[in-house]
């Protein structure tokens, strides 16, 4: 009985210890104090005991990042700024699994940590420039406490520095982290923790050896600031240019031209838990370029800046729908001026405008109609917001040209604007007309007829907005030329429009491989390459009852594993995808299977087509049919040809992020014998499939499920003896043959015009 009770109590202690280990603490307070020798102490308080954090140090920019596993943040202010020669700012952020503290430094530094009960002390000092200096502990050791106190409040020390090499003595006191970037969106795996632990035991290499092999890598990091903005930091070592930034709906696409990203560095960070406008950050390779795709939600604005060559920061700020307005439509405004305080009573408005002009450095010109007095009491308000409040209170408005601001009553400015627009209209109606010929290089001139709506320009009086009332546009299909006659400003608009639209269309090389495989080959192929699939775009399976059950699933890893979904029930799942990294291995597998007589390649056509243009491939023959027609009491017989082909029609659509959406139509026609009354006539058996799927550039779409069966019965007998009843069965041999083969179609699209996608034969 005592033994069982002891086991139960021991189990409770173990469960309690495990619960305490897994339970999360919260960061409740951060305080900073100074020590001699230019050291700083950052004291991080928790509502319960916490384990020693893990972290890393960067020297450009100078920064220390600490991660607290299974920890939350319970502070009103998560960004703390300091006017200190060493420490400039502390930022706190969290996700579902951990919290991160980022210490921004003004110069490269190193740190030690101590865990004292429910506090973590972080000792920060500058990196030691003297390599051969004698060893000294970075932080003085705390006096020895009694055994009970040590058990109640354990103290663990660690030191990290990557900006300067260690001497042998320093190696005993501090061990450097070798991991350069730790993402705040993905928790540490046990493998990473073991790698970090082993890195602590390694010694630092000499400075010359580190400089001889620079780590030219591309990394991303995400954090949240005090304004609930998402900050994405992109480090692209070796990239000296400026990135191309574009916006596609809720995506911000940053492209580094001619900067190749290794496949192992492609990653995707899910940062939706941080409650910022940024939902997801993806770093991927697109041909010879590197793309950073920022997925957003809600209203936001982007602020980007470059800290140093190869280092870029993108801040996605949330836009708040507030009552700040400068007009009737209540459009939100953002005020960025220097904060000022004003306290006036019964002061002339012109005097207030004069004070705001001095505070802002702007040249403010007030109309003679601006007069009156007002009482104003503002504290720590941006000067541009104070100016906006004054104008709203007195029904004023402003027009800015460069560094000069003209302020007048709103009605007066509207009257001036109306007069100015009327003058421009009069000039357009009375100005000289010019003629300009635009010969298009890539687009068909007939396409511009629909773009410019030239056919609907005169019947109802609703002319095209680009052409003025006196202008005209002529089209010459023979020379592919637009002849525009209008004012100089309209012709310039045409020039800009044509420069944007008359560009070469992207082309796609579509390679199809039609393979006849033995029954069970598709199942073996799926087992070899692994199965995946969660999404689909669109499919029309009325002909076969086929289903589309594969696509790019939720796996964001870009490893070397292949992605093919050819399950055992091929009739229910007959359309699958192969990623671009695995297309070469798939071709080798098909070649090997053909050498073993498991497959037979019927056709391997290639066709080059433009983006969103249909490409058609057919292979087969035409069957003659006799058609009898009766007219005017007589009959005539004609022979018509009907196609019995294996046809493939593909229309590619290139997406902005380099994927390809393919609309595929497949028809398999073959001659067959059909019964018509007591006769057997020749007919055509047809099978059709229409589907739409998204494939990455260089990936492969696999379509299967078309089966052909060849059934036959054979009878071999001995002459005469085999015809004897009953006994004749001893002299007969019956055979039954069933041959079932599957038709597989492999479609591989490649975007042409980029390196690595040249024609291959």
Curated annotation (Swiss-Prot):
It is a peripheral membrane protein. Residues 1-24 form the signal peptide. Residues 135-154, 193-218 have a biased composition (Low complexity). This is Type IV pilus biogenesis and competence protein PilQ. It is found in: Cell outer membrane. Required for type IV pilus biogenesis and competence. Could function as a pore for exit of the pilus but also as a channel for entry of heme and antimicrobial agents and uptake of transforming DNA. PROSITE patterns: T2SP_D. Belongs to the bacterial secretin family. PilQ subfamily. Residues 135-157, 193-221 are annotated as: Disordered. The keyword Protein transport applies. One of its GO terms (biological process) is protein secretion. InterPro entries: AMIN_dom (IPR021731), GspD/PilQ (IPR001775), NolW-like (IPR005644), NolW-like_sf (IPR038591), Pilus_4_PilQ (IPR013355), Secretin/TonB_short_N (IPR011662), T2SS/T3SS_dom (IPR004846), T2SS_GspD_CS (IPR004845). The gene is pilQ. It comes from Neisseria meningitidis serogroup A / serotype 4A (strain DSM 15465 / Z2491). One of its GO terms (cellular component) is cell outer membrane. Keywords: Cell outer membrane, Competence, Membrane, Protein transport, Signal, Transport. Homododecamer. Tetramer of trimer. Transmembrane segments: none annotated.
């Amino acid at each position: 009985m005592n033994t069982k009770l002891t086991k139960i109590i021991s189990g409770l202690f173990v469960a309690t210890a495990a619960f305490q280990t897994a339970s999360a603490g919260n960061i409740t307070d951060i305080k900073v104090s100074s020590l001699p020798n230019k050291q700083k102490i950052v004291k991080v308080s928790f509502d319960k005991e916490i384990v020693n954090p893990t972290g890393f140090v960067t020297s450009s920019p100078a920064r220390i990042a600490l991660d607290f596993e299974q920890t939350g943040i319970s502070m009103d202010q998560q960004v703390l700024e300091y006017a200190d020669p060493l420490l400039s700012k502390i930022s706190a952020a969290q996700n579902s699994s951990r919290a991160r503290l980022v210490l921004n430094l003004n110069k490269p530094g190193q740190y030690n940590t101590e865990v004292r009960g429910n506090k973590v002390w972080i000792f920060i000092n500058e990196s030691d420039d003297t390599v051969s200096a004698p060893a000294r502990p970075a932080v003085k050791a705390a006096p020895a406490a009694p055994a009970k106190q040590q058990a109640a409040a354990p103290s663990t020390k660690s030191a990290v520095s990557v900006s300067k090499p260690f001497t042998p003595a320093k190696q005993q006191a501090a061990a450097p982290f070798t991991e350069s970037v730790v993402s705040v969106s993905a928790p540490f795996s046990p493998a990473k923790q073991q790698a970090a632990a082993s890195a602590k035991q390694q010694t630092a290499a000499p400075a010359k050896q580190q400089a001889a092999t620079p780590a030219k890598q591309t990394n991303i990091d995400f954090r949240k600031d005090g304004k609930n903005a998402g900050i994405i930091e992109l480090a692209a070592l070796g990239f000296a240019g400026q990135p191309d930034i574009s916006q596609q709906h809720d995506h911000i696409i940053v492209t580094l031209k001619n900067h190749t990203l290794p496949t192992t560095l492609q990653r995707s960070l899910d940062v939706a838990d941080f409650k910022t406008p940024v939902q997801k950050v993806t770093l991927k390779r697109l041909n010879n370029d590197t793309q950073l795709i920022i997925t957003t939600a809600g209203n936001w604005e982007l602020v980007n800046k470059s800290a140093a060559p190869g280092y870029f920061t993108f801040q996605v700020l949330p836009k708040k729908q507030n009552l700040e307005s400068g007009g009737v439509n209540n459009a939100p405004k953002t005020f960025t001026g220097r904060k000022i305080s004003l306290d006036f009573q019964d002061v002339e408005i012109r005097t207030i405008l004069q004070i705001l002009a001095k505070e802002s450095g702007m040249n403010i010109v007030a109309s003679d109609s601006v007069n009156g007095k007002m009482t104003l009491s503002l504290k720590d308000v941006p000067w541009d917001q104070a100016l906006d409040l004054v104008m709203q209170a007195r029904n004023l408005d402003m027009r800015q040209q460069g560094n000069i601001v003209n302020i007048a009553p709103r009605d007066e400015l509207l009257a001036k604007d109306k007069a100015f627009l009327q003058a421009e209209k009069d000039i357009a109606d009375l100005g000289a007309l010019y003629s300009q010929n635009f010969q298009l290089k890539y687009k068909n001139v007939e396409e511009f007829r629909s773009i410019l709506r030239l056919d609907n320009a005169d019947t109802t009086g609703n002319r095209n907005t680009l052409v003025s009332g006196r202008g005209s546009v002529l089209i010459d299909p023979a020379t592919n030329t637009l002849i525009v006659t209008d004012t100089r400003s309209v012709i310039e608009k045409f020039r800009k429009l044509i420069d944007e639209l008359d560009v070469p269309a992207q082309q796609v090389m579509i390679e199809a491989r039609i393979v006849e495989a033995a029954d069970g080959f598709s199942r073996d192929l799926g087992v070899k390459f692994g199965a995946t699939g969660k999404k689909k775009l669109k499919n029309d399976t009325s002909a076969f009852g086929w289903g589309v059950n594969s696509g790019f699933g939720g796996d964001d890893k870009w490893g070397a594993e292949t992605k093919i979904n050819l399950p055992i029930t091929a009739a229910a799942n007959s359309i699958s995808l192969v990623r671009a990294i695995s297309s070469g291995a798939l071709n080798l597998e098909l070649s090997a299977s053909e050498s073993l007589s498991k497959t037979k390649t019927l056709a391997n056509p290639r066709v080059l087509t433009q983006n969103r243009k249909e490409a058609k491939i057919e292979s087969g023959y035409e069957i003659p049919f006799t058609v009898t027609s009766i007219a005017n009491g007589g009959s005539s017989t004609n022979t018509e040809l009907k196609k019995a082909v294996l046809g493939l029609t593909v229309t590619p659509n290139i997406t902005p992020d380099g994927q390809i959406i393919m609309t595929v139509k497949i028809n398999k026609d073959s001659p067959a014998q059909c019964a018509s009354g007591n006769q057997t006539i020749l007919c055509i058996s047809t099978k059709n499939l229409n589907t739409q799927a998204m494939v990455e550039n260089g990936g492969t779409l696999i379509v299967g499920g078309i089966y052909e069966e060849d059934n036959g019965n054979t009878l071999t007998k001995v002459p005469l003896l085999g015809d004897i009843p009953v006994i004749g069965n001893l002299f007969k041999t019956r055979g039954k043959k069933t041959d079932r083969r599957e038709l597989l179609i492999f479609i591989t699209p490649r975007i042409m015009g980029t390196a690595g996608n040249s024609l291959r034969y």
